[in-house]
Every structure is written in structure tokens, then in C-alpha cells.
Amino acid sequence: MNQPLAMTLTQKAPIISRSLGAVVVVALMILPFLALLPAENPLAISTYTLTLIGKILCYAVVAIALDLVWGYAGLLSLGHGLFFALGGYAMGMYLMRQAAGDGLPAFMSFLSWSELPWFWSGSQHFAWALCLIVLVPGLLALIFGYFAFRSKIKGVYFSIMTQALTYAGMLLFFRNETGFGGNNGFTGFTTMLGFPVSATSTRIALFLATLVLLIASLALGFALARTKFGRVLTAVRDAENRLTFCGYDPKGFKLFVWTLSAVLCALAGALYVPQVGIINPSEMSPTNSIEAAIWVALGGRGTLIGPVLGAGIVNGAKSWFTMAMPEYWQFFLGLIFILVTLFLPKGVIGLLKRGREK
């Protein structure tokens, strides 16, 4: 039974690697404050750059969440885009209520609605929004996972079911009568906790909150990898039948990490929305969930750090390609997946580890 690569890297990582990680964290903590510098200052960064990096950090959290279920438990989910979007919609409901004040959100007025739907009750309160962000995706993952794992669904069938769930969610949210803005979704946010969303200081706070979530997700992942729980998850991935013969019930372990992964995605989605200023059903597109799997594969499954690198590499390249050669972006993404499958089965982290051993 193979030991989790994340645990191996953590135990054997030289001091210089840990120091490099600390330098990166400090640099990311300093980075948002460069947006406060005058535009003529060579160190100044634009609000666009700050938002772009904040988006990538949100995606990095999604990559960690997916790595927990795919890299450790061996469950390839193609539905994490749904949990990400649900967290974003929960935050969007709060932001829309803040923008509307005592009235109805703009899209409801446009559709001639006379009152808020029942499920919007309390959405003007930030504390309730936080509850929705955690509980709605968490409960959905818990219910779906309970029936899927009880039925012993795994492999490609599990992947297909998660993608079908995401696609169904996207179709549901596209409908105007569901009360979530239809095709346009939520936009036009003005304030958050009384602060202007577009203010640079608010952007900095959101960036730092995303960074804290990323660090906490990594810390939680590494902590799990070092415990008996992490070793059992790896056994679920490598030899589930043998684990069952040893007296363990894999369903509980898979259900816990599946639900935890969904909640992490939702928190990332909640921080994503106020930074980009919009949430719509396209975030639930099956291609987004497939793209997240590419981040993990490129960085290296079961490493936690690798998926963070993969998310950064792919989304950084995507930003450049969509500006320089937008018509070729999908070809580039497909090429990455093919090359990683053929030449980097253990991802970038596996390549670095192999080079260090030589």
C-alpha cells in the first residue's frame, strides 16, 4: 500500500523548500497592499491584477478540495463546480440584498415579482449567509454521498453521477422562475458588511481572507495526511476490498472527506463572488469541473501543494491565452491534459521529486 505522497514530501522536504513556502506566503500577504501605491510607482499593481490573483487563490482552494477526494480517496469528482457555485450563490444572495436595501433585488423587480421567495428569508444577514454557504453544499454532498457510497458506486460511474448532478444544477439555476437570476445570475453588488465592494481596502481584505482560507485548507490537508485517517483514505484508494476485510467501513471515511471537500469548495466560491462581482449558472458548467481535475493532475494527485501549483499554472496561462489567442485556449487546455497523462502521470510535484532523487 503506497504512502500518501503529501506525507512523504512533508517528512522529507528540505529546510530550503519550507523556507521557500514561507517566502511565498509572506509575498502574498504583502502583494495586495501594493494596490494602494500610486499608479506611477513601479511596484504598484492594478485592481485587475489583484482580482486575478485572488481568483486563482480561490481556484487553488478548489484544487485542494478535489485532491482530498481524488488524490487520497480515489474518487474522481466531476461535480465540484456545483459546490463552488452554491457557495457563490449563497454569498450573492446576501450581496444582492445589501444592494437592494429594503426593496427587492433588481432582477426580481425586472421580472415583476412582488415579494421575496421564502428561501431568501434572512439572506440580508451576513451570519445567515455564512450558514447557507456551509450548510447547503455540505448537506447536498452528505445526502448524495450517503446514497452513492452505500450503493458502492465508484470509478467512472461515480464521476458520471457527479457530473450529472452538476449539469442538473446548472439547468435548474438557468430558469428565471427559480429565483436566482436565471442566465444573468447575480451582479451589481455595492456593499459588503457596510463597506463598498469596489473599494481597494475591501479588495485587500477579501484577498487576505482568501489567502487565509488557502493556508487553512493546506494545513488541514497535511494534518489529515499525517493521521491514521489519511492512511485509511489512501487504503480506500489503493485496496478498498482489503481494507474492508480488515474490519474498516470505507463508507464513513469517504463520506467525511467528500463532505469536507464540498464545504471547502463552497467557502472558496463565497470569497470568489465579491472579488469578481458576478455569479451565474455558467460556474456550474461541467467543463469547469473537468478543468479542476486538470489542475490536480498537472500539479500531482495526493500532494496538496501540487494542485495549488496546477491551478496557478493553468489559470495564469488561461488569462494570457484568452487575451493573446482566445480562440486557441481550449486547444491549449486539452494539450495540457494529454501531455500530463502521457509524460507526467505524477504531475509537476512528481517530476520535481524525481529530479531531486537523481
Predicted segment positions?
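Transmembrane alpha-helices and adjacent helix-loop boundaries
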Residues: M1-K358
